[in-house]
Design a protein with these regions (language model features):
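N-terminal Rossmann-like dinucleotide-binding module
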Residues: 1-48
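Acidic-histidine catalytic/liganding microenvironments
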Residues: 25-26, 62-63, 127, 139
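Local beta-strand N-terminus motif with an aromatic residue
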Residues: 30, 65-68, 142
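Conserved SAM-binding strand-loop segment of SAM-dependent methyltransferases
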Residues: 49-56
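Short amphipathic alpha-helix with an adjacent loop that forms part of the alpha/beta core around
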Residues: 56-64
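Beta-strand-loop-alpha-helix segment that lines the small-molecule cofactor/substrate pocket
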Residues: 67, 73, 78-122
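Predominantly a Rossmann-like dinucleotide-binding segment in NAD(P)-dependent oxidoreductases
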Residues: 124-143
Length: 143
């Protein structure tokens, strides 16, 4: 069975969280990890049996990689989203895209006709309804 090759940019807490979840899926191969801190990238790559990119562009130029998980610092998100657009990759980006709404609006206009998916991670773990469900589940009242 062919696996989809994915790269993760950012090997910190959230990058490692996503990379490990992705690697647990039978149809996914976390092929490459990139982080400005090469030690963090190497540590995560060792756990996942992945490659480490020497630079960010290496990920985008790799034709096997179909999707990019952007888990780096917020100021770099637009750069990596634009590269995803340029290299025609699917992208998942941690929130926020950028801190300046004008930059976000300009980017959204630029990618209006992007052929692949771009998804923004917007977890709701602090949403009151999610907190209530979590509390109920932990109580084991319903199984």
């Amino acid at each position: 069975m062919n696996k989809i090759s994915i790269a993760v940019i950012g090997a910190g807490r959230i990058g490692a969280f996503h990379a490990k979840n992705l690697a647990s899926h039978h149809k996914v191969k976390v092929k490459t990890i990139y982080d400005l801190n090469s030690n963090s990238a190497k540590k995560l790559a060792n756990v996942l049996n992945s490659n480490v990119a020497d630079n960010d562009k290496e990920i985008f130029e790799d034709k096997e990689i179909k999707a990019i998980f952007i888990c780096s610092d917020t100021p770099s998100h637009i750069k990596y989203l634009e590269l995803s657009h340029l290299y025609n990759k699917h992208a998942y980006c941690e929130k926020p895209i950028h801190l300046d709404i004008n930059v976000v609006e300009k980017f959204l206009k630029k990618i209006k006709n992007h052929k692949n998916s771009i998804q923004l991670g917007f977890h709701r773990r602090f949403d009151p309804s999610h907190q209530k469900i979590k509390k109920i589940l932990k109580s084991k009242k319903y199984g």
